[in-house]
UniProtKB/Swiss-Prot annotation:
Protein name: Protein Smg homolog
Matching InterPro entries: Smg
Membership in a protein family: Belongs to the Smg family.
Disulfide bonding pattern of the chain: none
Pfam families in alphabetical order: DUF494
Organism: Aeromonas salmonicida (strain A449)
Length: 157
């Protein structure tokens, strides 16, 4: 499923291609590209749920977060998000790339991936997908894009 998400993001989102594509047409294109129908369906459902997080009248993930508060991870989150991923999420929040709400959306989307262990690169791409989808997050998206594509500058401190 993650490979399908990456393909879609790189093909349609990151390349500024026409994003308005019929689902059947998209499914056919992905099948021709060699992706399994089940994986395609999972990826499209994942994206639909991401889009619905902002379109629905659901309660906000985090109503308020006190300055200096720390996110405590549940056991199932700890099992899938290693120290490196959790540290990077904290870094992104401290750098104001993520806020409490977008952090929670990222965690929820990461846990819905069909991967037992989530790697740092997976996290970076999911954060970009989330920020791309959140209205008003253009600057945060641009910062994240620089972090992902300008890794040759060295380690981030």
């Amino acid at each position: 499923m993650f490979d399908v998400l990456m393909y879609l993001f790189e093909t349609y989102i990151h390349s500024d291609a026409d994003v308005m594509v019929e689902q059947n047409e998209l499914t056919d294109e992905l099948s021709r590209a060699g992706f399994d129908k089940d994986e395609i369906e999972k990826a499209l459902n994942w994206l639909e749920r991401l889009a619905n997080l902002h379109d629905s009248e659901r309660e906000v993930y985090v109503a308020a977060s006190a300055q200096g508060s720390m996110r405590i991870y549940a056991p199932q989150e700890l099992a899938r998000l290693g120290t490196e991923c959790r540290g990077f999420l904290l870094f992104l929040e401290q750098a104001q790339v993520l806020n409490a709400e977008t952090r929670e959306i990222c965690i929820e989307r990461l846990l819905e991936l069909d991967k037992p262990d989530i790697e740092l690169d997976d996290l970076k791409w999911v954060v970009m997908m989330v920020l791309f989808n959140v209205p008003g997050s253009e600057n945060a998206y641009q910062q994240m894009e620089e972090l992902v594509f300008d890794e040759s500058d060295g380690v981030i401190h």
